[in-house]
From Swiss-Prot:
Keywords: Hydrolase, Nucleotide metabolism, Nucleotide-binding. The gene is dcd. SUPFAM superfamilies: dUTPase-like. Catalyzes the deamination of dCTP to dUTP. One of its GO terms (biological process) is dUMP biosynthetic process. Pathway: Pyrimidine metabolism; dUMP biosynthesis; dUMP from dCTP (dUTP route): step 1/2. Belongs to the dCTP deaminase family. It holds the Pfam family DCD. The keyword ATP-binding does not apply. It is an enzyme of class 3 (hydrolase). HAMAP family: dCTP_deaminase. Homotrimer. This is dCTP deaminase.
Amino acid sequence: MSVMPDHWIKDKAIQEKMIDPFIDYKESSGILSYGLSSYGYDARIDNKFKIFTNINPVTVDPKNFPLGSFIDKEEDICIIPPNSFVLAKTVEYFKIPKDILVMCVGKSTYARCGIVVNVTPLEPGWEGYVTLEFSNTTPLPAKIYAFEGACQFIFLKGDSQCSLSYNEMKGKYMKQLDVTLPIVNNS
């Protein structure tokens, strides 16, 4: 696998709408940076958040996630409670080519404050807004900022195309438009 450079990311974003909207430079003046970097793309988060709370003490179960465990907020700054997490989605919509796997890593600025971002790989053929999870690992409240850089996506090109893409597998998170909670298919 090869890590794809800025010019490849830019070409795919412009020609195939791989990232939309796409910022072809690094915006960093007084904010958490976002946009095109040497070997990746720093994405932003929207201002709609699902804040995990323990007001209804239940067992967290990915097969039967307790919906009442979230508070929905729409604001430019989100406060993550101590030792808790928040779900958000990217501003950018992604369309991943069939020969590309995308990995996500956190921003060093957030990491240095005890805020960790987590997302699973964007698989070949997947498209949608990316649901991100921000964990506050500290015993104090922590802030994250809407419409600023939240994470970096790194594009890995496979030696050949996969036999079956996420779209062709009819993946359960295909074309998600909002923050999406866990889905377990019962087939």
